[in-house]
């Protein structure tokens, strides 16, 4: 069973999305067990592609990666909520804005991550990489893709590790260093490697599909 790493392309004021760079750098390794996908920041295409890719690959691990401008560290998302909404000023790549609506009508209120959060956080601490467990993935496409992936894995009955990692801005994207925190690409990549290693070491799913 493979590992899928899904990032996003540019959006809004960010002509470069570090999640895309991270995912493409993983693709260059030529790991036969790794599948990398970069999606546009698009509601419609994310809604269509995430379930399609989940069914196509039927992975053991699904990790989404996205940019969270303003955050000071890597943030492993604890939960995806069944809520999508963003204003016209933050319209997606197709010009779509959303007034509060469910990600999946009739779906559960939330999906908890099944990534091994404890080992990931410990690996970050040991490597000196700033990171924490976040309690909100927002209500934009990052949360949308996280929830959609978890919902798709559940519908397919897959004992799949599903989760999402938010990364800060890259230093070269910062226009006001005093107000905009950032993290170097090398440190982000090292943090992502910690996540992947912890997932590979996780034991098979226990009751409820949660990996130990």
What annotation goes with each model-predicted range?
Residues 1-139, 150-157, 180-212:
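N-terminal catalytic or cofactor-binding beta/alpha core of small enzyme domains
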Residues 159-163:
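A short pocket-lining beta-strand/turn micro-motif at the edge of beta-sheets
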């Amino acid at each position: 069973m493979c590992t899928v790493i899904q990032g996003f392309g540019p959006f809004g004021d960010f002509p470069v999305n570090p999640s895309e760079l991270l995912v493409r750098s993983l693709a260059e390794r030529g790991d036969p067990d790794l599948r990398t996908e970069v999606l546009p920041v698009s509601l419609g295409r994310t809604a269509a592609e995430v379930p399609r890719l989940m069914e196509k690959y039927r992975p053991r691990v699904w990790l989404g990666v996205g940019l969270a401008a303003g955050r000071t560290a890597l943030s492993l998302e604890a939960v995806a909520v069944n809520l999508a909404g963003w204003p016209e000023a933050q319209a997606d790549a197709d010009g779509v804005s959303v007034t509060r609506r469910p990600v999946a009508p009739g779906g559960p209120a939330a999906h908890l991550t099944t990534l091994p959060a404890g080992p990931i956080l410990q690996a970050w601490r040991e490597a000196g990489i700033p990171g924490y467990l976040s309690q909100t993935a927002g209500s934009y496409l990052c949360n949308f893709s996280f929830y959609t992936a978890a919902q798709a894995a559940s519908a397919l009955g897959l004992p799949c590790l599903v989760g999402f990692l938010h990364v800060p801005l890259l230093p070269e994207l910062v226009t006001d260093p005093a107000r905009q925190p950032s993290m170097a690409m090398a440190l982000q990549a090292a943090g992502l490697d910690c996540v992947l290693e912890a997932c590979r070491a996780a034991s098979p799913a226990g009751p409820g599909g949660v990996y130990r």
